[in-house]
Amino acid sequence: MKATQRRDLLIQTLNQATTPLKATSLAKEFGVSRQIIVGDVAILRASHHDIIATNQGYLLADKATSVDDSRFRGKIVCQHLADQAIEELTIIVNHGGYVENVEVDHPYYGLIKASLQIKHAGDIQDFHAAMDKSAGTMLSSLTNGIHLHTITTPDEATFEAIKADLKAVGILLDESI
């Protein structure tokens, strides 16, 4: 199979996917190495295909951000140590919240944003396992723990309840500072 055919099939596969697809799975499906898939994704992005990488795999951007219009969407500003990240995510998910992303405002690079796509406890476990396995550091380590999350909730009252619970455990950054 030629590279252009593989990339066309890759876009079709991502278009049909309802969940993120890991590069290793795609590599196995197409009979190439993981690194070839990573390169294909880079080439497709340069060709104006909006593919995002989450900690769970690749996803087309329109699928990642398709949110029911009846749900409330807002941003929260948090500050915590790395060992409090699971508590933060658990509070949000236990209320029925969906953590779309994390953002930090780096003094040199400006806004750095990463897709999370965390909807349930299993996603939190996967995130935690991936961080442990890679010995990775939180993006917020660049900004003294300060970061933002875009979250989607069933309604505004749920969003406010999440904020109250995060504030109660000292994770929500005090808006009066």
Residue ranges and their predicted role:
Residues 1-28:
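Extreme N-terminal segment that seeds HTH/winged-HTH DNA-binding domains in transcriptional regulators
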Residues 8, 12, 39-42, 90, ...:
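Solvent-exposed alpha-helical segments within well-ordered globular domains of core cellular machineries
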Residues 20-53:
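N-terminal helix-turn-helix
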Residues 24, 54-55, 102, 176:
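Residue-level detector of family-conserved "landmark" positions at structurally sensitive sites
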Residues 28, 58, 106-107:
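Conserved beta-strand edge residues that scaffold enzyme active sites
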Residues 51-62:
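Minor-groove-contacting beta-hairpin "wing" of winged helix-turn-helix DNA-binding domains
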Residues 65-68:
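Basic helix-turn-helix/winged-helix DNA-binding cores
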Residues 70-177:
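Mid-protein regulatory/catalytic core that forms ligand/cofactor-binding pockets
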